[in-house]
Amino acid sequence: MPIAAATDFALNAILRPISDIFVLIYGLLEPINAHLIPEHTNFIYGQLSLLLWGTKFLATILGVTANNATAMANFTDVLHTLSENSYHFFGTVEGESGMAYIAKHSYIELSQNQQLSEDMAVKFARAVNSTIIYFVKVFEYL
């Protein structure tokens, strides 16, 4: 016996939490964007404006999906199809198919190829460092 109807699950466990995250992101970024004038470092203003627009757009899609019975039924059908076909997508614990196969063989490749794993670790650390530097520079311009 199911704990809840599929539409209740889709609405309360998926759509509303994601919508709340969008509201939180928008609520945090809007005061920063309102403080900036359009001429203020075009790069930063443009990126924040684009991020805010994208957040509003995705929140609108979630709102329409949650409030429209047809869209909600289609979303629920998609969730049902994904749950039935998850074996093919995620694979088995043994790693014989799907994403588990990719993860298993990636792990084997990285554990056997020291040079590749070191290169990937260095590139990941540099990417994290560049991201931190970027956000520090953004806040310096504010």
UniProtKB/Swiss-Prot annotation:
Q: Which UniProt keywords apply?
A: Cell membrane, Membrane, Transmembrane, Transmembrane helix
Q: Does the keyword Transmembrane helix apply?
A: yes
Any idea where this protein resides?
Cell membrane
Q: Which domain of life is it from?
A: Archaea
Which regions span the lipid bilayer? Answer: 12-29, 44-66
What's the protein called, per UniProt?
Uncharacterized protein AF_2122
Q: Which GO terms describe its cellular component?
A: plasma membrane
Q: How does it sit in the membrane?
A: Multi-pass membrane protein
**Species of provenance:** Archaeoglobus fulgidus (strain ATCC 49558 / DSM 4304 / JCM 9628 / NBRC 100126 / VC-16)
Q: What is its main location?
A: membrane
